């Protein structure tokens, strides 16, 4: 991992730290000089499981990890865990589209109010840097989960515009993170093991593909390069759901597919960057950085200084990015640790 000197003798807090992202962060930070990593989450069983895994696999890292039971919905528990923290990776979220669609206020309480609690505490505690994790579903959102994440992003940008003291707050936006908790590839593999056909919502539906290591790399890149309110997006290839199902069967065995129709709140394709955001985007090689819209309540300078364009030609979507064929999709899914373990029949060892 590059740029690890910035973490020397520092304290990093990960909200939602027992999830797929938090576990991958720990793997990446195993050989850094962090003084302490704080795992903040609400599930004591997952914390206990993580504690035991760390003690077995990396006793030295385990000695640096502290666990805090709490919920981002509870502002006081967030503040109690944040004393002395230098950096925060904010990953706590409700992210399942159907459950958020049926219980939208639960998504609001975690994704919107919870983020507001984290950012207010970070500013008050003088945290140096906060990287928040968002989703492609926040761009042109049509479902409750995406709308709650779009509101989360608005809170980030508002704090950046209004002044957050010494705290730099930025955001990353992800496509589909392969083999993260609740994602489709582990479901496909499980159904193949059981001899059941793969359930496909719409074979022409497209989704961005990235692995968990790339997700952590994106956060690291944002951490190193962010100005207040910046949004970072990784350039990512995409696959159709039909080709993804075909690729998984090529690797693990054929069981056929069953088209079941789209779920509540699903899109045919996802957008990582809107037309409007592309106007402010800087191409940084493997990533885009979208600068925060710095307008305050006085828009006069935009009238006086000249005309401002309102749209780029098109959004950056899973339909117009690099499209993987079945062979390319096979190569991509094999970069996921879960798939590598599953090829040896050891997927039960994967942490999700």
Where are these regions (language model features)?
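Conserved Rossmann-fold NAD(P)-dependent oxidoreductase catalytic core, especially the SDR/UDP-sugar
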Residues: 90, 94-150, 154
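Strand-loop microenvironment adjacent to phosphate/nucleotide-handling motifs in alpha/beta enzyme folds
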Residues: 2-6, 154, 158-352
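Conserved glycine-rich Rossmann-like NAD(P)H-binding loop of the short-chain dehydrogenase/reductase
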Residues: 33-49
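Conserved residues in the N-terminal Rossmann fold of short-chain dehydrogenase/reductase
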Residues: 41, 68-69, 109, 202, ...
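N-terminal Rossmann NAD(P)H-binding glycine-rich loop of SDR-like oxidoreductase domains
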Residues: 10-32
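Hydrophobic/aromatic anchor residues within beta-strands of the central parallel beta-sheet
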Residues: 67, 107, 169-172
